[in-house]
Amino acid sequence: MATTLRDILDKLLGRQPASAKTARERLQLVLAHDRSDLSPELLDQMRREIFEVVAKYVEIDLEEGEVSLETEDRMTALVANLPIKRSQAKAVSSQENGASSQEAVSSQESVSTPGAME
């Protein structure tokens, strides 16, 4: 389901897609679901989990993100289109540093001092 120049112009000019084209896209989606043997519930669960995993590393636009099944040349693919707002690499590394320093503090507290147990 590649986007063509005509599709882009239709969107910009507010034109509605032809009913035959819409019906064809719906049929392709139904065929993709049938061939993959994935229920809509399972696909929705996969979508949520994919969003959660990706959100650990980058901030994504949940409203614009989508996960879909696409069929081309008798091959079905799971396609995730997730617009990235910004990277969270700094947040991840600072969380790791925070955990390391917390572990260091905990290990220092557990070290017994001479005379403390007497």
Swiss-Prot record:
Keywords assigned by UniProt, alphabetized: Cell cycle, Cell division
Region entry Disordered, spans: 86-118
Biased composition (Low complexity): 99-112
Protein's GO biological process: cell division; regulation of division septum assembly
InterPro entries recorded: MinE, MinE_sf
UniProt family annotation: Belongs to the MinE family.
Annotated function: Prevents the cell division inhibition by proteins MinC and MinD at internal division sites while permitting inhibition at polar sites. This ensures cell division at the proper site by restricting the formation of a division septum at the midpoint of the long axis of the cell.
Protein name: Cell division topological specificity factor
Lineage, highest ranks first: Bacteria, Bacillati, Cyanobacteriota, Cyanophyceae, Synechococcales
Gene behind this protein: minE
